[in-house]
């Protein structure tokens, strides 16, 4: 498209990016919409396609896109007042920009992002629905702050456990529970294959938060997200002591423990791309990853050369502790749990074990339906000092329209946003890989779990899940040197102790009174 210009920022330093953006866009043409975009696993073809159609429908408007694999520069440019973009697509909403004013020179912006509430609540042109109504309720609520909206979604980002069907034995069954996942890992080892491969530098084992949520339940996790501890007290270090957090860590401990041999021996040395390719090549049977692996397959493998799929997230076996009607020995409780999972999955001939209550069935049903998503964090914004906010908002409305959604899906090769739409339409399925078809189908069937970490106690302090004053939990759990190893329980306790020691500072930073 001849009116499009690609301002490449790949591999440039922050200083060079600053120079390009401030120099290349010095004219700030009133009819040109400048967009900065992160170019990662989802690519930016969809953005160019949307921009091209937007130009056609808005005579006289030109869209120029600056794409970069280093979106860390976006935040610096925004808060320094040097951003020349009218729209920025990045990977995290950075709530401090909303909760705190930003001073640029002699001007104070509170907040520094443009208020999008008007287009969130207005009918999308040509449709009888609003942007707010097109978003799942949990995502809409995540973006809402004191009745206003400042962020716009641009990806779905499902994560979970993938398995390679090219090396999968027909005698193996997909695990219904974490105990079955561990048993499967043993079976795979006995068959002379490697159960898992990952990169310790960037492991994506963060999916273990789903096991924590399965155990605790959505109500308890919502309380945690609002700063409540298990004892009901708010803004206390005991916030980190939900039992399910330790239970989830214990599952991860078994999977990663060096002496168990469930993970490829090179997992601690390879980078993420290498680990991903090793999985796709069949060097390991399973991997924790996200739907963006599709792009890696397209880039490095011929069509039909790979065959992978997400499994439903296994239910944490210790969930039986929360289900009083599931009784018996540990083996009997696991068997009953598996039977209930079959029942909620709708497996052929599945029946409920005697005595299991409907309340416990629904608790397990909720747990089984959870799949992690990080798409809610893939958000775009308009700098409040942009001089083309009306055009930028119009672009957002177009992107959220049915037409815009279809353009996004087709141009991206099957990826989707969080906006609700009939993604199963045949015209969208044509040309999409079998992996993306199965991924989108599972996405539709699942409840999408994410940990907001939006409350000020998290977003203004940098508080992490189970890693406060610690390095990544995978480093401890996979350590072969006993001096470097920490068990799940040790991590759980150390995280709490570190929070307890610094809690006054956390409260002060978050501006929360006792």
Residue ranges and their predicted role:
Residues 56, 123, 143-209, 217-270, ...:
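Helix-loop-helix "hinge/cap" segment bordering the ligand-binding cleft or interdomain interface
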Residues 95-158, 173, 182, 330-365:
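Hinge/lid segment of periplasmic solute-binding proteins
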Residues 284-285, 341-414:
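Bilobed periplasmic-binding protein/Venus flytrap-like ligand-binding cleft at the lobe interface
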Residues 1-34, 56, 501-514:
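Short, low-complexity disordered leader/linker segments with a strong preference
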Residues 29-41, 61-66, 86-87, 196:
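Short, well-ordered beta-strand elements
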Residues 185-188, 225-269, 299, 308-361:
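Glycine-centered hinge/linker elements that transmit conformational signals in sensory
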Residues 405-406, 417-514:
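Conserved C-terminal helix/tail region of periplasmic/extracytoplasmic solute-binding proteins
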Residues 53, 57-134, 166-176, 278:
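Extracytoplasmic "Venus flytrap"/periplasmic binding protein-like
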